Design a protein with these regions (language model features):
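C-terminal helical subdomain
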Residues: 185, 205-242
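Conserved glycine-rich Rossmann-like NAD(P)H-binding loop of the short-chain dehydrogenase/reductase
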Residues: 31-48
Length: 264
């Protein structure tokens, strides 16, 4: 159903060229929202924008931005402000991971992941939260991970980064609530988004059984954001895993999760 409000609602989606970001764009376009799609791959963004305009008759703006550059995030905000665009919903989805022993990974690759998954996510949240606070309304969804609930062998930096995202979301949920802003952390498990290939992951049979399609994950995130929830874990199997992590000693759930994540 399209958004029939006379006031145009703008949704900014980072990492919109694939995976969860692309699916968020499709679902929000179907609802009739105007979109700002942000990613590095301009050709993918333009193709997606053309499809969404044709299918849903919505306004779509494409912004090719390297989000690892904080100055580029500030310039993005300035360009939108100059066009009179105020972001009502921020989907902070951009990020990447890398599987493997911590000490074997090139240092520049590790720091690049920290920059995008932590520093850049913080920067874009800060920039647009300031604008939302002035208007006393807005919604922010931070894409974390089920791995945020514990340190994970061979995903040391990624799981630590996503733990930061989850804790940031929990804190901001309470902090910005008084300003009329909802902040929700989405904690998906293994999903068929292309992330595994980009992270050079080997998919175990256990992981393949747990893998979700992007659409239900995104629907769960949007529902939780609209319901003003602090966080959400999509999918029954992922919820059970989160409960298992919460209810068992650290040594036990770390051993179990490592078994699931390791390629055999």
């Amino acid at each position: 159903m399209h958004n029939t409000s006379k006031i145009k609602t703008w949704v900014l989606i980072t990492g919109a060229s694939s995976g969860f970001g692309e699916e968020f764009a499709r679902q929000y376009a179907k609802q009739g929202h105007a979109l700002v799609l942000v990613a590095r791959r301009l050709d993918r963004l333009q193709a997606l924008a053309a499809t969404l305009r044709q299918q849903h008759s919505v306004e779509v703006i494409v912004e090719q931005v390297d989000l690892s550059d904080v100055a580029a995030i500030v310039r993005l905000q300035e360009r939108l402000r100059e066009r009179g665009i105020a972001i009502d919903i921020l989907i902070n989805n951009a990020g990447h991971g890398l599987q493997g022993p911590f000490a074997d990974a090139p240092l520049d690759a590790v720091l690049s992941m920290v920059q995008l998954d932590v520093a850049s996510l913080t920067a874009i949240t800060h920039v647009f939260a300031q604008d939302m606070r002035k208007r006393r309304r807005g919604k922010i969804l931070l894409v974390a991970s089920l791995l945020a609930y514990q340190g994970v062998e061979n995903f040391a930096v990624y799981s630590a980064a996503k733990a930061y995202v989850l804790r940031l979301g929990e804190a901001l949920h309470r902090e910005l609530k008084q300003d009329g802003i909802t902040v929700t952390a989405l904690c998906p498990g293994m999903s068929d988004t292309g992330f595994a290939k980009a992270a050079q992951m080997k998919i175990t049979p256990e992981l393949r059984m747990l893998m979700m399609e992007p659409a239900p994950v995104v629907r769960a995130g949007i529902r939780a954001l609209n319901a003003h929830h602090m966080s959400v874990v999509p999918g029954l199997a992922n919820k059970l895993m989160a409960i298992f992590i919460w209810a068992t000693p650290r040594w036990l759930h770390q051993a179990a999760v490592s078994r699931v994540m390791k390629a055999q």
